[in-house]
Amino acid sequence: MAAAHKVFELSHVFKDVSKIGDDESVCSPNEDYFGVPWKIVLRHKDEKMGVFLSCEKPSNNDAHCIVNVVYSVKLMSSSGVCYIKSDSKLFGEITEHGWVNFVNWNTMVDAFLIDDSIIIEVLVKTIFMSGLPKKSPKNFDESNKEFSDGIVVVKHQNFHILKKFLAFHCEYLEKLFFGDFKEAGKAEVTLKAISSTDFHYLLAVLYEDYAIDDDNVGGILRLASYLQVPIVIRKCEQFLIEGSGKPMEIRLDIAEKECLQNLKKHCLSKVGTADQIEAARAILPSDIPKRALKKFDESNKEFSDVIFVVEHNKFYVLKQILASHSSHFKKIFVENVDKREFTLADIDSNDFQNLVEVMYGVSFIDDLTVEGVLHLAHMYDRPFPMQKCVEFLIDLSEKSPKEKLKIAKAYQLKNLEKAALARINLPESIRAALSCDMAQMEVEVLKALMQKALFHLSDTKVHTETFF
């Protein structure tokens, strides 16, 4: 699978352009992506029109931020003429990149100025990001008490957890909580010789509340290997393959130490010699095996306290997992405290299986499952799975922009709509998007597509080069 590059688009109509004096600049409003404010800067200097992409350091972040991007700047006119320049730059100490002489000022006035206004569009694809602000991981202090039945103490820090949920993911903790250990049955257990920070991150990843990154992946992976938590090991490996900015040599070293065969194969294919690659192919699987469905049948009864019946299939699950992510199910459980079995009508059991897997953190959404999971997440008011579906559709899905626009309209997903529109730039993709029932399109979407189509009506392209 390709690396999960982030793509977004900035677009702004600059008005009263004739009033911009020499050596003056005007800016578009800041737009926040990945916790960083971005904007377009238009500058008039020495009869030249400069255009710059600005990536400012967040005011609440003291870390050294680095963002490597490829970007394409397009100056557009309603007559169909467009002028494009592209580049690849590293934002860090330097927060602004672009062209002092994007186009001659008089050329801009003659060819692009309409009603004293011009339209500038910037398409950005991130290659690597580091030091950006992160959201704090989920708290497992007393505020999480409602959704817990036990306490794990690490370095004098109390973590309020759900025993059956952790036991479901970790055989060691299953034995600790419910086996022959002296701690079994106790409300509070202590884990020694591990970092409380790493344990906090591991819990947050298990609860699907925190993203693995280059700063924490080492600690999370070591602890997941020590406690043998397969799903977290798998997620760390996937990040190191798809999203890490660490040098390949370092990732290969991690793969060797932690026996991550898919990561090892990936690294050797990037940096190894022909002999090394051939040797790796001989001992490693050619493809990542298709995952087996996680069973929520009677074999999971020990780690459940409620049953859902869907199309005659019984799913043994934990109330707290469903209630913690869905106000709909929380209300059902509150109103039916003593009820053990519930029936859900008019939904597909495969979709429910996929949804529960996402809630338990044992499945990665893909193009085959995303719409079913999204449908049920929307139906049962589950923001977390919806967020995961949107992230997948924006970052990893191979669905066409037309398909994504259709999904965005069905579930009112504005971020997905904007991301899909940003990827519609070639004439064939514009035609494909416009081939659907335009009467069903949102006015703003139709307007954006028609505007893009207009840019391609003219055969005149003053300059076109792009990395996209």
Swiss-Prot record:
PROSITE patterns: BTB (PS50097), MATH (PS50144). InterPro entries: BTB-MATH_domain_protein (IPR052664), BTB/POZ_dom (IPR000210), MATH/TRAF_dom (IPR002083), SKP1/BTB/POZ_sf (IPR011333), TRAF-like (IPR008974). Residues 7-124 form the MATH domain. Residues 148-215, 304-368 form the BTB domain. The keyword rRNA processing does not apply. Pfam families: BTB, MATH. SMART domains: BTB, MATH. Keywords: Repeat. This is BTB and MATH domain-containing protein 45. It comes from Caenorhabditis elegans. The gene is bath-45.
